[in-house]
Amino acid sequence: MESNLSAKGIFQHASANASGELFQEPVTEDLEKVMQSKGLYSMEELCSIIQEAYAPRVSVLCSRDADEFAMRKGYPKGFWELLYPFGDRIRGKVNRRGMNGEMLTLENLNLHFVPIDALESHLSEASFPSLRSVLCERYPGLVSPEPPSDYSFGVHYKNVERWAWTLAHEGNYQMPLPVYVRQLLTGIPITPFETFSHPVAHLVVVTSHNPSPFESLRSLINSIPYLSLPAFVFNDINYLFVYVHDEDQHDLELSMAIFDTMKQTFGDCGYFLRLHSQKATLDYEHTVPFPTSSWLSAEERLHLLSNTDTEIRLLFESDNESLRRLSSHIAFNGIVSYLDKCVRAWDDQYASPRRGITGKLLFASRKYLSSSNASTNSNYFPSSNAYRPFSPEAYLRKLADYSFMLRDYSHANQIYEIASRQYENDGACLYSAASLEMIVITEHILHLKMPYMSLTNTLRINEYMQSAMLNYLNKSFNSYYHAARCFLLLGQFLSCLPAPKVDDAANWNAGLLYSKRLGPVGRAMIFQQTHTLFKSLSYLKTESTDPFSNKRTRKAALWCVLTADAWLRCRIPFRAKPFVEEAKLFYGKIDWKDLKECVAALDEVEVSKQPASNIPSS
């Protein structure tokens, strides 16, 4: 059913009446409590989502025996599936000195384990053999000929919308926006202008079932350079290995001896993992449910929603503890130390020469003295929208992202500032937009405990936000996903401030809606959040005698109608009905023909769940 509310009619009637009182609930002076009670989340929650999303990626390369080991335990996607959920909120913590001298505590870290097949280039026009095919040709039987997992990078908007549309039809589900934001951030694609989806380490897995584990591990490690990655992805990165001991069938002392030999040969970057090869079932004691990752893709969540299999997957408690201990060791002993080493080395090599007066003079000389011959002095290739691999500019972005992963936001902010000036000078628009976006994000995270920015800083942040969106949207090579993400995150930051900038947040949300970067359900959720923002202000006591002073009551009513219209366009009338009824309280004294027709049509619509194939276009 299509709504009869036209945009023209809405804006004509929105300011026509200010006499109706829309809200009847008691007022309160605690804005934060009001916002949380109305379904809005806190700045801490938003920052936590971003910290978890922009976490290190670890690619997983498994031998054939490792994948078969996991399959026998009931995990058909191979050994990667066993590791997948244990990268969430890793237990333990470590203290690290930041680049500016302050002590940082790293805890509740995240790792995103991804199958190595998902990294191989689908972005390149040239056809290269996959690493798996190379290994099968050179070492028959070393790996499975077909990848056991179909995991892929990037957001598939149709699947995200199908997932949201399916949940929206659940009458007892409240459709919280943080869940949608998290789902959008699960699909960060592999691009040259940001490196969060680039792997920081390769994890190689072999088991005690391998007849020649030492030679197999050597072959797998030596084959990593043959990965067919895009040119902008650095393959010269850290590697780790895991030797899995079968507790049920093999001798522990023999496995320990083999593992010690591996460490002597390949370095102290290995981990010994003890697991049962038997499948855990309800018949066994000391079992726990297999955890579900909080960063499942939209495709995986759709599969869970449509899955009719009621079997509960279980793990032995000892296996669960071993996998948690393994992820903790990998995170703190392997990844954090490697990132810290890279940050300190690259900061001295690439960032230090660009700081201070010397750096400014060098930048000015490059900008003005070489402007006549910019194409030969720059490492940027406009034809491919990418910098030369291993160029200083490429390392600058990687340095900033690594600092962000280490939660050294002050240092990351400085590097993003340095990099953005360089990218703007080179005409690298997407690089510049991505750096400006991260400057805004790091500024808000840094001001989490200092919510009130200076006017100068606020104006600077607003300018960065505008520049980032112009670069994302107004270039011939604009990025559909990154524009949507930038609009969404900036609007959410403004919405979540302790003293929320409701009008600014509404403007960014309106820009996101106007750009049509989201599907119909996502747009309806943004309409609803903006309405809730304006509505939350109406509960606050003010000293003004004007009943509508700083309350945004009329704007709340306007966005209430827009929310109802958006849900009706999604053909989900039971979600639209409360907003229509709420709007009638405000506009009851106005003879609004369109609204009355909408309400009458709403009463005639049967609230039923439709198949996801019937999702309307926005």
UniProtKB/Swiss-Prot annotation:
The keyword Transmembrane does not apply. It comes from the Eukaryota. It is found in: Golgi apparatus, cis-Golgi network. GO terms for biological process: intracellular protein transport; macroautophagy; meiotic cell cycle; vesicle-mediated transport. Its main location: Golgi. The keyword Ligase does not apply. Keywords: ER-Golgi transport, Golgi apparatus, Meiosis, Transport. GO terms for cellular component: cytosol; TRAPPIII protein complex. Component of the TRAPP I and TRAPP II complexes. TRAPP I plays a key role in the late stages of endoplasmic reticulum to Golgi traffic. TRAPP II seems to play a role in intra-Golgi transport. Has a role late in meiosis following DNA replication. Belongs to the TRS85 family. Part of the multisubunit TRAPP (transport protein particle) complexes I and II. PANTHER family: TRAFFICKING PROTEIN PARTICLE COMPLEX SUBUNIT 8, TRANSPORT PROTEIN TRAPP. This is Transport protein particle subunit trs85-2. It comes from Schizosaccharomyces pombe (strain 972 / ATCC 24843) (Fission yeast).
